[in-house]
């Protein structure tokens, strides 16, 4: 057995297979590509796989190391859910598998953490302050009391207590003859301290100290009541004996019991007010209570000869005189300690009953203030963050107009279940971009043979019909490894390529259709969006490193390099666009221009708005959210160069660095992390299955922290938002859960810029906290509205200020940007706020484990390393099933083997397989067979006879019958007129141009036989060219000729128009040259197409293979300016193409030519010499 066979799992000869599962299709003739599939027929792949894996132990236990964070999380999970037995989850919850049960436990733990976090926050904001300061909302000072002076809000204070007289003051409650009260008179007293209007008889208030009922205090001028008829004098001093006030016990027996029902709280004084009024009031603080002896001292002073008025001890009175407005508690206790218990009690009762006027404002104490200060600190922090985001978004100025860029860009579009209208909109918008058509490639990946809801065809068929691909084109599926578990890692896909014309734009495209294994029945080929992204990323990575490739990747390489005519290594950027997104015409150019200006940008995104804003109520509530999420969050993060969420619907990634060509987006680090197959934990499920686009951004930031991710508001795209609540619910479930898990990853990432609170990690933490407490925010807002509406508590000015700051700054933002329509969208968004902040998060958190769990691996242990056992119901898979080969080796083998090998179909020299003849379509039938219903668009190699045996390859191919013909090549349909392009446009024949010019060369007017599409003749190369006019991919490098009568493409190709030399990037094997010389000119067969990077000339912008002669070394240490200018002219004159020459490369060449000279200070002179030479101003 050869070395190749030893490593080839499909080396089993077909003769050893006794059963043909497709024997009923024996009448159909087709063959398969052994180089792409190995030695096995793809239709029998399932049988061969099982035979190959028969000796492998299927129940082998695989140990996966567990991180310390994972171990601690598992402990916390079990600590939280220990009281829920596993058999309950199995019996009641239907969760039979341990990994599903563990995910439910993790979900429950996360929901419990979120619940307690929300509860703690609500408790702290609403209830914690009440526990620390129970009567915080039951105290009023003079200014606060004066606010309750309305007809329906009538508050007043009497002896340190606030009462609500709103339901009392309107009635006539006077029983004094000829004295009536009115509501107007009563309103004059609202919101005031009415202590002076309710004097207490001294014989009642100070029973043990005063016995004379005729004694009364004389108020000072400042304490004299202004409305005399409102004074409630009781006892013998009341002149009207018929009034109830004549009763000396009216105050304690009638008044106090009545107002007790109206009590609201305390009347308080601040220490500042006490000190200020202490200049004219003799009051002081004792044990937090305020006593006012001003009227007493005024009375004593007035009646100095009557000792009955001096009923208080002089030691007590002297304290009020000497320390007015101060706290005299200590001195008061010292004075009271000299009294006996009876006199001490009588004195204290007298002070409380007659001279008590209120309390010190306890709300100013540390116990009551600590919560407010903490809330204020958090509020300032949040408002500062919002203000910073506002300033970041406030980028006023004129809209920039960058120059047209010339970088090569791949526009990747993953397609799943979208409808024809959405797909056409996306494809047309990309084709119509104001960007050089030759430098953009539409790369569409159809994720499985899926028929979307409401579609009458599968998604791949819709895509191919839009592009104009002939339904008869049926390429053979090729193997590649998918991102999946178990046997689903083996996948098959078909490749189509061609040109798509839209409104004058002619853009190349490649369509990859994942079709799956032959045994797949449910959603064949579908592996998810992440697999589609990895497919392209891994392919470009292998192109960059010239690494061994899967058969599918080899075919894509061939299609890009030999059919489309552009080396895949030329592409510098990947534009990722969803299949329901429409990019504005200048969007791509703006993104590329920003990346070209700043080489440190690794990824960039633009603004995404809604294309169906007024589609339904559910779309309208999303308009404002989309706008703010871009212009606040992303604009702010962009200032730090750390946009944490680049939307998958419209983002541009840099493939390699601009200085040294290091792989960036296609680096092994990103691909290895992003292509994780074992997604068996809740965290990984949310990262890789729900939020793959966001996690991709996280990986970019994690692996390349020195590079920047940016947001450009000028680049715009429009996407379709969910217009039904069910779809919105599903989308937000994915978004919210993936946001939580991705932010948790970013919080642990020390590479983010900044330090401590001044860092992106802190901003990420704030975003994470804000996401998980969204339900608490909604509940608090409801509480706030109810509190303010019912006036059951003081107005929370801090909370209202925060809300005003958040939405006020947002309103200022779109008003300054003159986006007036967002005023209405803001109102709609506020109305729908409960949906976004409460219902959707609650639903999302509880359905965090809502996945489709595979059955390939079952977790059997969580202690130490995780042990995983392969499921016995899964088909076996091993990486050795898929052959790998470098493109250069593969191509060299093709040249060596097929140049001399007879074709299975016609016996003529040529190549079959993915790199077979791209021009000749070998068939024994007449040429007319290939002219009917043709298309100008090509797939990869066809899997069945052209026009016969159509349908599914696995169903319609008899793989055991010896094939009589070689399969068609990928350019089979280029011979026909179909879609939007004619065959003559593709092959540069001598036929008249469809644009009315003399004759067609290449598609874009590069080297051709005559005038190109754009009228650029090329006298240097008298041959046909590639799709883009590069060296002729469809020319005959071996000198073969096609006769007009029997030309496979139905056009005349004179010998003079064919390249008999065949310059190409690969050295032509001597064997191929010999065969070419002996093949004859009438064989009707062309050999391998030549490279797109050959036969360079001045009009070939892509030619880079010709090597320019190096400048002669000059040992002078101080060369003259003339010598330098001469060297510049010589270097530029030796360049085969100036398209890839930069000023920097010229300067580097000069540094090498003058090794002993210091040329850095002559940079400006060198640049001027370059400009003069290119403009023709320099003299040779």
Curated annotation (Swiss-Prot):
TM spans (from-to): 108-128, 374-394, 762-782, 795-815, 822-842
UniProt-annotated glycosylation sites, renumbered to this chain: 737
Reactions this protein catalyses: [(1->4)-N-acetyl-beta-D-glucosaminyl](n) + UDP-N-acetyl-alpha-D-glucosamine = [(1->4)-N-acetyl-beta-D-glucosaminyl](n+1) + UDP + H(+)
Coiled-coil regions listed: none
Keywords in alphabetical order: Cell membrane, Cell wall biogenesis/degradation, Cytoplasmic vesicle, Glycoprotein, Glycosyltransferase, Membrane, Transferase, Transmembrane, Transmembrane helix
InterPro entries named in the record: Chitin_synth, Cyt_B5-like_heme/steroid-bd, Cyt_B5-like_heme/steroid_sf, DEK_C, Nucleotide-diphossugar_trans
Observed effect of gene inactivation: Does not effect the dimorphic transition in vitro, mating, nor growth rate. Leads to important alterations in cell morphology, particularly at the mycelial stage, and in the staining pattern with calcofluor white. Reduces levels of chitin synthase activity and subsequent chitin content. Almost completely abolishes virulence to maize.
EC number: 2.4.1.16
Main location: membrane
Boundaries of every DEK-C domain copy: 1118-1175
Induction: Expression is slightly lower in the yeast form than in the mycelium and shows a maximal expression in the log phase at about 14-18 h of incubation. Highly expressed during the chlorosis stage and the stage of white tumors of plant infection.
Subcellular location: Cell membrane; Cytoplasmic vesicle membrane
Gene Ontology BP term (one): fungal-type cell wall organization
Listed SMART domains: Cyt-b5
GO molecular function: chitin synthase activity
Membrane topology annotation: Multi-pass membrane protein
Family according to the record: Belongs to the chitin synthase family. Class V subfamily.
Name under which the protein is recorded: Chitin synthase 6
Species this chain originates from: Mycosarcoma maydis (Corn smut fungus)
UniProt lineage: Eukaryota, Fungi, Dikarya, Basidiomycota, Ustilaginomycotina
